[in-house]
Every structure is written in structure tokens, then in C-alpha cells.
Amino acid sequence: MNLFHRQLRTSIKLGVLFCMLGVHGLAQAQTYPSRPIKMIVPFPAGGTTDIVARLVAQKMSESMGQPVTVDNRAGAGGSIGADMMAKAPPDGHTILMHNLSFPLASVAQALANRSPFNVETDFAGVSIAVYVPFVWTASPTVPAKDLQELANLLRNNASLQYNYGSTGPGSTMHVLGEAYKKSTKVNIMHIPFKGAAPLKQELLAGRLQIGGDQLSSSLAEIKAGTIKALATSASKRIPELPDVPTVKELGLPSLELEGWNGIFAPAKTPKDIIERLNKEVISAVRHPDVMKRLSDLGAEAVGSTPSEQDAMLKKQMDQFRAIIRDMKLE
């Protein structure tokens, strides 16, 4: 066999191989999903992230031809469920719904050299599903209408012993609470709780003075006047609470932070599957029924691209790194 025939034979073999790979990829895209999809929620049932996940999962089930079931895997501030997700096969049949605490937990654990995963390398962004504003709350017994009045109250009354609650060490409210203490030079003690529900109960009872969480966790109580809203961390005032100032308006720009719920897949999930998931998430959150329910929760339907989600995640991780290092929380 001369050189020409050997080269021709090699070219034919390569061509057949590439065709087979192309057909395999096309078949994979056409058969996905081939079984039920599990959506991990790394928090207990009943919270904002869980509610949003169930709304999205229901609509995805209707359009994808396979059940999308929510699997609550709570613990360690969301890290247990996220770690399970990082180890799942990258085939699109296991996805994750997480929130603002995802980049925070990753940064805090990395700085402490105990992170089981890397948000930037172990996960693939699918979409920011919704924006959910973070709101600073207080017991109605607190004689301050916003965060600056609270700071003045504490500075001028050294005998006051106020506490602020969070959903646990290293949580969003814990970090923001310490940032608030440093920015305003006030003394206020951190009390960690095991979730948003017990924190809210202590606020309602007046045994806890200050708290903070996603708006949907306390919107009903704020509207009823049983919990007071001191500020939101959003970049602009939110329609549900038009009289509540933003932290930036109050001269506390370092506390500005967009709250969100988003969908992730394992790293190395094929691009065509990411694109399909993105399309399905956008369709779900923009369905009129879902948008109405989200609005009732104080959330805003988004449905971003994967690249927009990646950019936001990087921005918030940089922000959290700066806050944690500045306050030596690591």
C-alpha cells in the first residue's frame, strides 16, 4: 500500500469517527432528559429557595416530559447539598437550586481551608431564576425606623444590649451584621439560629432585636406591622416596600447586595444540556402563574443566561472575599 492509499484510509477512518461522535452528541441532545431530574435544594422545606424551586420544578416537569423532583438536603449552611451536587454525574439529571449564601459559603470555607468544593470550577451556571431582595428587620419594640437611626440609638445609649440574629455562623446576615458593626462602630451581639423560622419567632416575641433574610421570609409580617423593616440591600427601593430605604441611601454602600435564587449543574455538563436547562428555567419563571406567585413572595422573575449568572457569581465572591478579609472573619 503506497503512501497515498494509507493517507486516504486514515482520512476515511477519521471521518467515520467524527460522524459517529456527532451522531452520539445529537442523540444525547435529542434523548435528554431520559429519566427523572432531581433538583437539590440545600435548605429545609418551606423556605424561599424551596418555594421557588418547587414552582420552577413543576413547570419544568410539564414541559420536559420527565418529572423534576425537589430533594431537600439541608445542613452546613447549604454546603451538604452543594457538595452532593458537585459529585453528581454531569448529565443534566441532577441540578441545584441555591441562593446568595452559595458564593459566601464557598469563599468563607476556602479562606478557612476547609471547602469541599469550588463554586467557580465544580459547577456550571444555568440561570439566575429570580431576584429576592435581602431585608434588614427589627422587632417593633426597637425605637428606630432605619439602620442609621439604629446606629445612633446604640451609640447614644451605651447601656442598650441589642442582639442581631442570623441563620448560622458564616451566613449572609452574619457577615453583613459584622460589616454593619464595623461601618457604624456600634456594639451588637450575634446570635446564630438554626433557620429563618426560629429567628423570626424571636423577633415577633421581642426577645431578638435585629434580623435579616430574604424578603419573602418576612414580607407578610412586615405588611402586618408585627416586624419592622429597617433597610433593603437592593440597589433600588423595592415596589413591595416603597417607604423602606436602601442601605446605599442610608450611607452604607458596602452592605449593598442583590439576593437571588439560581440553578446550577455539575461542571462538564454538555453545553447543549445547559442550553436546554436554561431555556426551561426561563420558560418556567416567566410563566404568568409563576410570575404572580413570585410577586406575592416579593421576588422578581429573571431567567438570565449562564454567562450573566457566572458574572454575578464572580462579582459577589469578590465582594465577600473583601468583607471577610477586612473583618478577619476567616
Spans of model-derived segments:
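N-terminal (or domain-start) structured segment
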Residues: 29-122, 182-214, 221, 303, ...
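Short coil/turn segments
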Residues: 46, 100-101, 139-144, 166-171, ...
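Solvent-exposed, non-membrane alpha-helical residues enriched in polar/charged side chains
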Residues: 38, 58-61, 65, 83-86, ...
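Bacterial N-terminal signal peptides that target proteins for export
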Residues: 2-16
